[in-house]
Amino acid sequence: MTPPVTAPYCRFEKLGASDLDGDETLLGVIEHRTGHTGVSLAEGCPRTAVHTTTREDESFAEAWHAEGPKESGSHDGVAWARTPDYLFGVARVPEGGRYAAGTAAVYTGIFDLIGTLGYPSLARTWNYVSGINTPNADGLEVYRDFCVGRAEALDARGIDPATMPAATGIGAHGGGITCYFIAARAGDRVNMENPAVLTAHRYPQRYGPRPPVFSRATWLSPPGADDGRLFVSATAGIVGHETVHHGDVAAQCEVSLENIARVIGAENLGRHGLRRGYALADVDHLKVYVRHREDISTVRRICAERLSREATVAVLHTDIARTDLLVEIEGVVA
């Protein structure tokens, strides 16, 4: 009997963990640390390091796994590994004065790769953007510059922004822009919105020449399976399209968690055709991004109170897409 297919899953490991050596389920490794590296394909596994924290004792490796025979390669700067059912890839936009063209090239490369290899369901993306709140060479904020490039890639390939999955767009302390993703060959992929927050690609132009494009969460399950993964986008203290509780990290953290709870709850999942529901206690492998180091203890306390004691939580000290946001939270529900 053929074993059932399971959706990709994540583990947080210590840097250099020996138990990753020879792991045939390993699809990709992203190291979060106090420096960055280039994208590589080591022993059939895409790897890179992103500069997402300022203390080495907060560093860790984000390891993505999937069952099944694996092969790997590279295509137009994207290092990738795949099983018969899932594809993981990593690419980098080099550091520079402008990012739109480089971002457009990376994303068109990703879209072409998933089409060529036959994994059309893009299920999750991450984008770590160096100097995210700083001006580019033309005076445009780097995050907005990035959003222009991503939107241009969608335009070039005729992709509806509403089909884009859960995503993270967060700061890094150097290294250009690192993009990585998960895509599926088949199965169910359901993108979800938050009824209390405006759909990202409908944000008004005050947030930039082109809006961000992502869903608030994405459900991914193998063909014919009842179980799967719910990928929760990096989620902030936003209601409608407005940042709330300016300068109050505790209140913003609470709203972030409330937004996650609303997205993953039974009422919202039912609205998107899924007969299931989750609570904050079901969210695991969370990454919590905090702008100011002095706020980390407050954020840790609130997360400890609201999340499961069994949850794996990594806190990273880095900038956030809007200058008035102090914290963002992402996670996975399995």
Swiss-Prot record:
One of its GO terms (molecular function) is ether hydrolase activity. The keyword 4Fe-4S does not apply. Keywords: Hydrolase. Its EC number is 3.3.2.13. It catalyses: chorismate + H2O = (3R,4R)-3,4-dihydroxy-3,4-dihydrobenzoate + pyruvate. Substrate binds at residues 143, 150, 203, 216. Monomer. Involved in the biosynthesis of the macrocyclic amino acid-linked polyketides rapamycin which is a potent immunosuppressant that prevents T-cell proliferation through initial binding to the immunophilin FKBP12. Catalyzes the hydrolysis of chorismate via a 1,4-conjugate elimination of water to yield (4R,5R)-4,5-dihydroxycyclohexa-1,5-dienecarboxylic acid (DCDC). This is Chorismatase. It comes from Streptomyces rapamycinicus (strain ATCC 29253 / DSM 41530 / NRRL 5491 / AYB-994) (Streptomyces hygroscopicus (strain ATCC 29253)). The gene is rapK.
